[in-house]
Amino acid sequence: MGQKIHPTGFRLAVSRNWASRWYASNTQFAGMLKEDIEVREFLKKKLKNASVGRVVIERPAKNARITIYSSRPGVVIGKKGEDIELLKAELQRRMGVPVHVNIEEIRKPEVDAQLIADSITQQLERRIMFRRAMKRAMQNAMRLGAQGIKIMSSGRLNGIEIARTEWYREGRVPLHTLRADIDYGFSEAETTYGIIGVKVWVYKGDHLGRNDAPVVEEPQEERRKRPGRPEGRRREGEGRPAGQRRGAGAGARRGTDAKTGE
């Protein structure tokens, strides 16, 4: 199941959170969900060159708070904040409520799965060999601290007539382990031969759950004593000089007594 299911949806209740965080009645839910999808598509087209990893939408009390995670926040903000003000006005017009826009910087874009997928698709659209693009992305991710990465490309690779799928993996990517921090990204390249889909899984380590706290080892002197062995007493034979057999001292004394007759 872990190989097929969406890694983020699989871990939502364990180590991941929703990208849309709000509550709505049954009559309003579908409309608000459609609005979120349209806002994300608009931001994806508008900020195509800003390296946007993900967009989080919150709706507190007739307002909207949109957090944009980008590796190039200067492109989103623009000169003296002009671009972000225009973006905020357009979002308010689309959503019909006051909108607050926050920009969060992605410190390591080389290990962000969505940014890796977008980078590979941009290279494919520029006619770069897909194997070279995939292997270069894997090397950069492993160099910057990823514990494992898997990249899959599907479609008419290199313009061949029959579509196929190729994937490469480096390190370990435990998709069945719920506590594993798996970042997932998907992107599509629109080439002259058709669409090529790129999927990326990045393994960044394990999340510690409530019962998985690290165990501190007890000092040697405070360890519990073995059962049936009182403190301060040693077994017979412990502490003898090396090479001396058990009972050798008593036998030697008896032999001396027999010779002297004492």
Curated annotation (Swiss-Prot):
The residues covered by the KH type-2 domain are 39-107
Q: Name one GO cellular component term.
A: cytosolic small ribosomal subunit
Q: Which domain of life is it from?
A: Bacteria
On whether RNA-binding is a keyword of this UniProt record, the answer is yes
UniProt GO molecular function: mRNA binding; rRNA binding; structural constituent of ribosome
The record's annotation in Gene3D superfamilies points to: 3.30.300.20, Ribosomal protein S3, C-terminal domain
Stretches for region Disordered: 211-262
What CDD domains does this protein map onto? KH-II_30S_S3 (cd02412)
Task: Cite the SUPFAM superfamilies for this sequence.
Answer: Prokaryotic type KH domain (KH-domain type II), Ribosomal protein S3 C-terminal domain
One GO term of the biological process aspect: translation
Pfam entry (one): Ribosomal_S3_C
What are the UniProt keywords, alphabetically?
Ribonucleoprotein, Ribosomal protein, RNA-binding, rRNA-binding
Q: Does the keyword Ribonucleoprotein apply?
A: yes
UniProt biased composition (Basic and acidic residues): 221-239
Q: Which family does it belong to?
A: Belongs to the universal ribosomal protein uS3 family.
Q: How is the subunit organization of this protein annotated in UniProt? A: Part of the 30S ribosomal subunit. Forms a tight complex with proteins S10 and S14.
The record's NCBIfam families line, in alphabetical order, gives: rpsC_bact (TIGR01009)
* Reported function: Binds the lower part of the 30S subunit head. Binds mRNA in the 70S ribosome, positioning it for translation.
Q: What PANTHER family does its record include? A: 30S/40S RIBOSOMAL PROTEIN S3, SMALL RIBOSOMAL SUBUNIT PROTEIN US3C
**What's the protein called, per UniProt?**
Small ribosomal subunit protein uS3
Organism in which the protein naturally occurs: Ralstonia pickettii (strain 12J)
What gene does this protein come from? Answer: rpsC
